[in-house]
């Protein structure tokens, strides 16, 4: 059973551990700072934390196993060529600066991938000492079709490294669809065909470049299968992302986070809500939905979750599952942190007083 959780919040990074009496918030780091994301690397026990200091920029910190946190290199964009007109899908100038680190994933030996706003993808082959921008994705002419969704600027929030071949990597962009490389970043192709958005011109609804996937996950046990929580609902692919099909769930198909069972590609969890202007749980009742049959049916899971006057939203990185597929953790915008040790059948509230939670990760 998993024993630790890294919780990234608006006011610091918190470690949560499991003892004899249950789950407890143990230590806090970078208190008062905006910690957008954390990563635990099981290869050597190293932890990474990204901090957004606003005016003072984005920083990346690393903690070797048993050591103190130290600052390491932050992914950095090259200087924008003089005279280059670089506009996003809204027609706004693109700033060539790291404005947020939105995704971190481990890959091959010593390799870490990093997704950022305004849409640059970086790779480190020395565990964060140095970073390389994937120039062929950044310079792709279709990048200028990307636009901001919930944020004002586009960003890469999901990175799926294929367990069969680490040279194959897929990234999801809000809003810019899904992109895949099969040669370790040398070339890239759009892979959001079949997705459909419902908040724009009908003539453009199925354009892959305008899709807004909120979160994408790949099945470790059956890597040709993917799940996406999209702005316009739930989508799945059973053929390596070549084609996506819509899946309907109640009480809502809208949400941000999704996780897939590590040993069963047809089992996945979502946190539904009312979309767009509202972005609150349906009827003020906090629930999780789970499918065990590839999206044909869903079960509403609510034991231990508030069913009246609940206004929690779970962000795209606010839901996580452990490697055994038994324990889930979920953190909300109101500072609630819940853990389930039975695949979501029931939930225990670990804390209701944390700052706004951006992301959770098992460690």
Give residue spans per PLM region.
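Extracellular glycan-interacting surfaces
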Residues: 1-363
């Amino acid at each position: 059973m998993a024993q630790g959780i890294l919780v990234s919040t608006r006011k610091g990074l918190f470690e949560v551990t499991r003892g004899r009496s249950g789950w407890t918030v143990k230590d806090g780091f970078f208190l008062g700072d905006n910690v957008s994301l954390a990563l635990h690397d099981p290869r050597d026990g190293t932890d990474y934390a990204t901090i957004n200091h606003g005016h003072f920029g984005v920083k990346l910190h690393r903690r070797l196993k048993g050591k103190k946190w130290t600052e390491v290199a932050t992914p950095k964009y090259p200087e924008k060529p003089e005279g280059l007109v670089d506009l996003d899908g809204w027609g706004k100038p693109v700033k060539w600066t790291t404005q947020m680190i939105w995704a971190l994933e481990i890959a091959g030996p010593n390799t870490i991938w990093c997704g950022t706003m305004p849409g640059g993808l970086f790779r480190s082959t020395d565990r964060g000492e140095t970073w390389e921008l994937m120039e062929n994705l950044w310079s792709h002419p279709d990048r200028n079709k990307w636009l901001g969704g919930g944020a004002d600027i586009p960003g890469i929030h999901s990175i799926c490294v294929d367990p069969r071949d680490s040279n194959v990597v897929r990234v999801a962009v809000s809003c810019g669809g899904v992109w895949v490389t099969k040669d370790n970043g040398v070339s890239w192709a759009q892979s959001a065909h079949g997705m459909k958005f419902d908040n724009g011109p009908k003539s453009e609804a199925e354009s892959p470049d305008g899709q807004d996937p909120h979160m994408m996950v790949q099945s470790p046990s059956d890597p040709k299968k993917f799940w996406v929580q999209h702005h316009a609902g739930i989508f799945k692919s059973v053929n390596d992302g070549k084609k996506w099909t819509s899946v309907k769930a109640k009480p809502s198909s809208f949400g941000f986070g999704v996780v897939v069972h590590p040993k069963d590609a047809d089992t996945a969890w979502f946190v539904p809500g009312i979309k767009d202007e509202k972005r609150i749980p349906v009827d003020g009742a906090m629930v999780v939905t789970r499918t065990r049959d590839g999206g044909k049916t869903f079960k509403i899971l609510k034991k231990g979750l508030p069913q009246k006057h609940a206004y929690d939203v779970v962000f795209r990185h606010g839901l996580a599952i452990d490697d055994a597929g038994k324990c889930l953790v979920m953190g909300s915008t109101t500072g609630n942190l819940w853990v389930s040790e039975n695949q979501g059948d029931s939930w225990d509230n670990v804390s209701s007083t944390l700052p706004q939670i951006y992301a959770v990760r098992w460690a």
